[in-house]
Each structure stands twice: as structure tokens, then as C-alpha cells.
């Protein structure tokens, strides 16, 4: 059978495995036995068929992320991927601004330990001295139902708290400019972005929001009511989850 192997810092590899084994018993001996043993060892570890990296792959040429995480006050581990600037120096006098990339929808993790070919946007941040962070809240799926169930009938509530916890941790780092933290997201991430700007402007100074839902009573029912119940049964949940409720006092 064929399987793939990768992680956030390792390009995808295509490997061949086999459950069948060449004989290593008394029926074979000498060079045949040694050859069979070598072949079986290869099949145990996987025979490399293709390597996305290529022979000239040099990880130092790319802006690769590192895994980071925080633990909330109530015990949820929240994972993230942080990409540092190319000229990063944790001891430098000059500090770095931070760009958060968020989503926040239930059971939709953005942080995955898998290879993503570095794109132009990520490289732009790295070349321009900006720390780039992709982070997830408790409801993204990494904490199972214990985290996901907390989003039921109260979308955005715990997600916003978790992203604020992320920002609080990040701005405490000695090499971060606490007054230059921005956030960006699309779809549910657009909703999250505007909510963060309205509810936590002391943490997030600017944002770019696209395609968000700003009043859940106007969105499609098959998604909304799966997580929020109906507006008639959950009026308070819909009120709190509406960007308009928070934007009026912004």
C-alpha cells in the first residue's frame, strides 16, 4: 500500500509499504537471506517513491512555521503555528509587529501539522519583519467534544476569549510590539476579526475581514441552527453573536 508522510516543516513524501515479507527462514541462506532481510527492512520503513522536496530542497530558503501553544485558565490547550521574520533576533532592541490569521468556526481547525507550500503572502510577512501566527480556539476540534460543545448556542463567545488569550500571551513576549498586533480572517474568520476589533481593541489594533456573518438571523439555517438553535429558542445567543450588537458601541 502507498502512504504519504509530511508535517509543517517537512514536504510531502510518497512511500510504499507492504505487509508481505520475503522469507528469512531456513529455506534461504547466504546472499539471498541478506537481500531478503534488507528488502524487508525497507518495506518496514517504507520505500520512498516520490519526495516533494527534491534534491535541491533547502529549508533555510523558506519561511517555515514552528509549533506553539497556550493553555487557557480552564485547561484547554490551544495550538498555533508561528512563522518568524527572516531576520528574526529575539535579543534585538527593535521589536516585531504580529499578524494573526484566524477562523474560529466549530470543528474547523486551521492549525494542522502538515505541509503547506509556503506562499507569497507568508513570505511577504517574513521579509517585512512581521511575525505571522495561525491559531485556533478551543472549539476548532483539537479538544474534542469538550471544546466543541462550548460553542453550542453561543457562537463567538468562547472563540473571542481564546483569541484574546492568545493575544495576551503573544504581546507579553519581549520581542513583540504590543501596540502593533493585527488580525485577518475570511468567512467565519471575517466574523471573528470584526468581533475582536469591537470587543478587544486594546489587543487588536487593526484587522482585515472578508465574507463574514454579521447577523446570524440573516445567514442560512443549515449551518446556523446546527450550532445556534433557532432565533426563537435562543434570542440571547443570537444577540450576543451579532457583530451589530458590538459595533454600535465601537
Task: Tell me what each language-model feature is.
Residues 2-250:
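Serine-hydrolase catalytic core recognition
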Amino acid at each position: 500500500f502507498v502512504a504519504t508522510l509530511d508535517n509543517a516543516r517537512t514536504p510531502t513524501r510518497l512511500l510504499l509499504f507492504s505487509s508481505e515479507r520475503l522469507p528469512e527462514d531456513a529455506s534461504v541462506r547466504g546472499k539471498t537471506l541478506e537481500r531478503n532481510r534488507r528488502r524487508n527492512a525497507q518495506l518496514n520503513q517504507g520505500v520512498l517513491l516520490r519526495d516533494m522536496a527534491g534534491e535541491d530542497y533547502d529549508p533555510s530558503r523558506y519561511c517555515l512555521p514552528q509549533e506553539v501553544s497556550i493553555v487557557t485558565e480552564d485547561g484547554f490547550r490551544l495550538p498555533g503555528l508561528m512563522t518568524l521574520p527572516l531576520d528574526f533576533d529575539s535579543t534585538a532592541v527593535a521589536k516585531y509587529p504580529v499578524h494573526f490569521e484566524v477562523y474560529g468556526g466549530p470543528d474547523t481547525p486551521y492549525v494542522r501539522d502538515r505541509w503547506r507550500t509556503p506562499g507569497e503572502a507568508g513570505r511577504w510577512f517574513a521579509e517585512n519583519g512581521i511575525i505571522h501566527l495561525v491559531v485556533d480556539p478551543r472549539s476548532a476540534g483539537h479538544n474534542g467534544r469538550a471544546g466543541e460543545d462550548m460553542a453550542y448556542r453561543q457562537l463567538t463567545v468562547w472563540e473571542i476569549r481564546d483569541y484574546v488569550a492568545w493575544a495576551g500571551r503573544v504581546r507579553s513576549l519581549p520581542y513583540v510590539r504590543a501596540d502593533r498586533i493585527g488580525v485577518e480572517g475570511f468567512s467565519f474568520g471575517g466574523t471573528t476579526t470584526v468581533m475582536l476589533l469591537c470587543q478587544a481593541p486594546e489587543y487588536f489594533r487593526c484587522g482585515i475581514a472578508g465574507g463574514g456573518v454579521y447577523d446570524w438571523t440573516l445567514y442560512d439555517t443549515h449551518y446556523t441552527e446546527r450550532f445556534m438553535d433557532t432565533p426563537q429558542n435562543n434570542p440571547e445567543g443570537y444577540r450576543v453573536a451579532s457583530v451589530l450588537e458590538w459595533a454600535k458601541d465601537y
